[in-house]
């Protein structure tokens, strides 16, 4: 008997806009989607949702007394997390700075954006393709999620995967075919394969 799991994850990952056809919002969203090479608006709403949850947590902590153990403990943990992901500088160690964070701060820390800005890809869209086709690794771990949030200490370890043709791995399909036809011509083995691809 095959066991089928009917578990469903009910955790919200994004929140759609309250007013669907607001012109200013539509224009600003489209600009961000184009600038950061996002697949759809849902990817943007997902970032906005995580930002709003972080800001709500900071706002909640700011209402507590400064000497409150919960504010000290949770506030420091939140700031540490923001510093680790490069969203805040080491000098910005107050909860007020968390409230000033924007969606762009988060989008700048995505793997897709960082691969493009580091010059490994020709465009932001090329960067997404490289990541999805498993050409990029962070440290020793191959990462194929464009929305992967890069930590500050991991940023210098972003490189091409060892199995990728860009990282000195096995050459790609077209290059292998060209090398094969070149070796045939060199050995004088008659015509190259007739089934050329366009």
Curated annotation (Swiss-Prot):
Gene3D superfamilies: RNA-binding S4 domain. Residues 109-180 form the S4 RNA-binding domain. Keywords: Phosphoprotein, Ribonucleoprotein, Ribosomal protein, RNA-binding, rRNA-binding. The keyword Isomerase does not apply. GO terms for molecular function: mRNA binding; rRNA binding; structural constituent of ribosome. The modification Phosphoserine is found at residue 68. GO terms for biological process: translation. The keyword Transmembrane does not apply. Residues 163-198 are annotated as: Disordered. GO terms for cellular component: chloroplast; cytosolic ribosome; cytosolic small ribosomal subunit; nucleolus; plant-type cell wall; plant-type vacuole; plasmodesma; plastid. InterPro entries: Ribosomal_uS4, Ribosomal_uS4_CS, Ribosomal_uS4_euk/arc, Ribosomal_uS4_N, S4_RNA-bd, S4_RNA-bd_sf. PANTHER family: 30S 40S RIBOSOMAL PROTEIN (PTHR11831), SMALL RIBOSOMAL SUBUNIT PROTEIN US4Z (PTHR11831:SF26). Binds to the translation initiation factors TIF3E1. Belongs to the universal ribosomal protein uS4 family. This is Small ribosomal subunit protein uS4z. The lineage of its organism: Eukaryota, Viridiplantae, Streptophyta, Embryophyta, Tracheophyta.
């Amino acid at each position: 008997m095959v066991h089928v799991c009917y578990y469903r994850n009910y955790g919200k990952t994004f929140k759609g806009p309250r007013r669907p056809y607001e012109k200013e919002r539509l224009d600003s969203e489209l600009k961000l989607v184009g600038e950061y090479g996002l697949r759809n608006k849902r990817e943007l709403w997902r970032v906005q949702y995580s930002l709003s949850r972080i800001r709500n947590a900071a706002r909640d902590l700011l209402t507590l007394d400064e000497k409150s153990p919960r504010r000290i403990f949770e506030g420091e943990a939140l700031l540490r997390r923001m510093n680790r992901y490069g969203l805040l500088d080491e000098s910005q160690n107050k909860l007020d700075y968390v409230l000033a964070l924007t969606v762009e701060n988060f989008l700048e820390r995505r793997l897709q954006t960082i691969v493009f800005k580091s010059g490994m890809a020709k465009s932001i869209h090329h960067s997404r393709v490289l990541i999805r086709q498993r050409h990029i690794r962070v440290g020793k771990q191959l990462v194929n999620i464009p929305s992967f949030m890069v930590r500050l200490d991991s940023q210098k370890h972003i490189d091409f995967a060892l199995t990728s043709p860009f990282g000195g791995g096995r050459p790609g399909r077209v290059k292998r075919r060209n090398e094969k036809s070149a070796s045939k011509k060199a050995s004088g083995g008659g015509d190259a394969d007739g089934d050329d691809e366009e």
